[in-house]
Amino acid sequence: MNALTAVQNNAVDSGQDYSGFTLTPSAQSPRLLELTFTEQTTKQFLEQVAEWPVQALEYKSFLRFRVAKILDDLCANQLQPLLLKTLLNRAEGALLINAVGVDDVKQADEMVKLATAVAHLIGRSNFDAMSGQYYARFVVKNVDNSDSYLRQPHRVMELHNDGTYVEEITDYVLMMKIDEQNMQGGNSLLLHLDDWEHLDNYFRHPLARRPMRFAAPPSKNVSKDVFHPVFDVDQQGRPVMRYIDQFVQPKDFEEGVWLSELSDAIETSKGILSVPVPVGKFLLINNLFWLHGRDRFTPHPDLRRELMRQRGYFAYASNHYQTHQ
């Protein structure tokens, strides 16, 4: 598991003005910040990246960093350091991001470009085997016959970390709402590890550090099992997690009972946040100390939600962001 790199300073300065965007605490929690790009910044960004279709970003990976630089330059180079400090800050580590005027499925390509730019200011998004690209778009409908809970609308998708069944480092997760029709419910669910009242009990359990087998269903296009413990620590010895109830494969009675109790303790936590994410907005979270999931939808025959995800690793100049602080 990748060790979390901590920073000393809080990313939020309540009195600071930013160029090209605003930053405020969310209504749900001071740990979750809302970042909004201004109408002018959004317009200029989309104009400057218009020459590159999404396919160009798929084929030429360096262009993902090119569009990231364009966005940061439009924000007077204040955006990249703020994103990194927020996501690496244990007290926060989560952002709800949107751009004024980008809020319709007809702008889906523009949404992908914007999310790609933000993600590549903090690192690089990994190859997504489910889609064959560095991002994945998928649809939730009223009826689902898939082999995981990802697209099933009428049940809660339990809280989990991403990247549990792959060998690549998964430091961050980005989840964007591209479209929504005939939709009620289905809020994003978030739980910060430090707000989980049962953390100490499970983190100190003898099974917390035992390597366990994680195996994905066929739809994930990953055939190799991986082995790792559910819990680890960051560079300061604080708990981090790499867990999903659907894909962990207990080898015996002891592991199975413990994992079942762990799942119940997570799902019944009083620290869970319910966060509405309108079309065009996206969540960006530190995957090592935030768990995420989704609440159930109200059934409707024409229910439709389209999502886009990216997940990857942090990468930055070490002389700008101190470790062990």
Curated annotation (Swiss-Prot):
Induction data: Expression is induced by RpoS during carbon starvation and at stationary phase. Is also regulated by cAMP-CRP and Lrp, which play the roles of a nearly essential activator and of a positive modulator, respectively. Repressed by CsiR. Makes part of the operon glaH-lhgD-gabDTP.
The protein's annotated pathway: Amino-acid degradation
Cofactor requirement: Fe(2+)
Keyword tags: Dioxygenase, Iron, Metal-binding, Oxidoreductase
Keyword Glycoprotein listed: no
Annotated HAMAP family: glutarate_hydroxylase
Family listed: Belongs to the glutarate hydroxylase family.
Name used for this protein in its record: Glutarate 2-hydroxylase
Species name: Escherichia coli (strain K12)
